Amino acid sequence: MSLFWRGFALIVFTIVSFASVAAERPKIALVLSGGGAKGSAHIGVLKVLEEKRIPIDMVVGTSMGSYVAGLYAMGLSAEEVEQITLNIDWNKGYNDRVSRDALSLRQKQQDELYQLRTDIGISGGTVKSPDGFFRGQAMAALLRDATSNLKVQKSFDELPIPYRAVATDMETVTPFVLDHGSLAKAMQASMSIQGILKPVEWEGRILADGGAVNNMPVDVAKAMGADVVIAVDIGARLRDKSELTSGLAMLDQMTTYMTQVGTERQKALLTDRDILITPAFGNMGIADFDRIPEGVKYGEEAAKRVALSLDALSLSPARYKAYRDQKLSRRAQNSALPAYYIDRVEIVNNSSLADETIRSAMRVKPHKVQTREGLEAGVRRLYALESFDRVTYQIEERGAENVLVVDAHEKNWGPGYLNFQFGFTDDFESSSNYNVGASYTRTNINEWGGEWHNEVSLGTWKHLKTEFYSPLDPSQTYFGQISLGYDKETRRLYLTEEGALRRSRDSGQTYYFDSQYAFWSSEGSLGWNIRPWQRASLGISAMTGDISIDGIGISDVSTSAWGPFLRLEHDTLDSRYFPYSGFLFQGQLGYMRVNQDNGEWATARSRGSSYEVSLVKPWSWERHSLNLMLGAGGTQTNEPLPLFAQDLGGMFNLSGFQPHELSGRYRLFGGLRYIYRLADNDFGAFRLPLFVGGSLEQGGVWDQGHDIRFATSHTAGSLYIGSETFLGPVFLGIGAAEEGREAIYLQIGSTFH
């Protein structure tokens, strides 16, 4: 017989033999139910199945079960699934807030003043809210990472193990079986808990967590052709009478009951050949993701309790090796890659922004290799524009091309958004300040992301502002802005016995008077966003209004000023109030013409340059941070009542003195601030870290440049405890300075100015 025919006969014999072996055993399906963190028990079951050499021919899951099933369907071992799951910070999946380092400089500054980010929308005069407590953006990124962002599948039958996920079609409230597409997106659809995570749009359907309608989809496995079903039930138990103590408990009881009714219907489909595994979890709950190793053990224990039934499905070592080799071969043919050559980029633009603006934020171009890390960074940049409800991407094979599809959905409860402000400070002696306010931002008024931003604040400081801001190109590199505002504040002027502003340690006895500043102001500028966190702007500002000082007969001093300015800003701090990394620089150089007249003086006119610089640089190690703080300012204008006076006083700004207590034409300040993170208090959806620390400060103010010297500056320091909360920063501290000065400070919420 020729060599050709011998080879042909061998191939035919191998195929027939393999088919014969496959035909000798039943097709086994693994069905994994939903149950949050308790889904880790599925991994324990997988471990036992592998130990017993039980082949899985198809895998079906709901909710958390769809996640474990999906990873196993990729051809991963139980140990690999466990390692990936342990490495995931599941709490991050429920935190869609854009981190500070991803925000633009403009967004950071708005957040500092109007820190209560409610995400309330205004559209057509109607108040709207999101359709889910969390957007699912972070969860999508988490699942893409877990699956290595596997390419879109024409059919989940092409995976090493055929796979199905079950979700709820929210329009009909019926089960929907996902059998193709993006694996990560299918998992997310099955896991998006109603009212908690935003539903997933899938080919015209609105899909959410499948647990409510089919938490243990035995019927799906049977429809796929399974001869034997191994089903794992991790569903919640009904509460007993003693636990039904609240309305939420009652609601949870009804939800659990409806889920159990569906599960019982699925159990009724099981035959004598099928195997049901029911882990016991003790007091482990669906949100206990920190107890995943414990859940894995519960799954192993439950699987071992049905060991005799499982043993009947065990293969010989040789046959199991053949099964495993075949699975690994299919995995190699359909595996995720760390980078892809992108032939074409397709933008599915469901927003009012231009396609080019989206492309620019993503920084993706066709005919280039794109890494997964680069694509994820692009998604974060686009989402950080805060115009989008959800931004996703997937890589599709279309013929010989790899097509990157970016799907960007604008928030459907905008395009106007409300945020709020609350701030309170008290020194427990003679001064307390408060402010409440709101901002309204109408976003995307043009296709490049222009905004109409408005602010109102009432309290110690009364503030109104309206501003138009617009990028001048699709990449948002250049911008123009114009604003009009009104401010009225009560400010204390500290005067010496001679009636001069208090400046140095030699000022002698000091008195303070409440002064009223009421001014209209306007500003127009053109700028360059060098980086999202760095910009330069050139413009003109003007202001006009009155100054009055109570107690000394000065009232309605008419004051006006105008002039050009150059402003440079850089902010990469990870936190504005408790920074551990990054760098902050703010600098402005201007030239102002000032007129001042109260009807009794001859009109006082002055002109001159002004400058202002501040810098913060943190260095950190472990839970410690040391911040360098530097500041300087000066003005050459010489109006009788201070308009651009350089001030010191207040916490971390010569602690021990009152705010604005030291005032002059020139200011120098330097300090070191120590921060220790005492507790993280990370609850996933929000954090409430606790800090303690202290500061050492040196600074002074002077009227003449040649008077600036260390001998007339002040030494000060502070000790404090603080936290970052949903209200903003909270500080309680004590400050002390030379001359026996002491002050207690309480600050809650946004700072003033």
What does each of the following model-derived ranges do?
Residues 1-8:
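Bacterial N-terminal signal peptides that target proteins for export
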Residues 373, 378, 390-573, 646-652, ...:
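Gram-negative/organellar outer-membrane beta-barrel architecture
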Residues 22-62, 70-397, 411-412:
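Patatin-like phospholipase
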Residues 395, 420-424, 436-438, 454-458, ...:
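Transmembrane beta-barrel strands of outer-membrane/channel proteins
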Residues 239-241, 311-328, 582-585, 626-634, ...:
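Acidic/histidine-enriched alpha-helical segments
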Residues 403-405, 417-427, 561-690, 696, ...:
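C-terminal outer-membrane beta-barrel translocator/porin domains of Gram-negative envelope proteins
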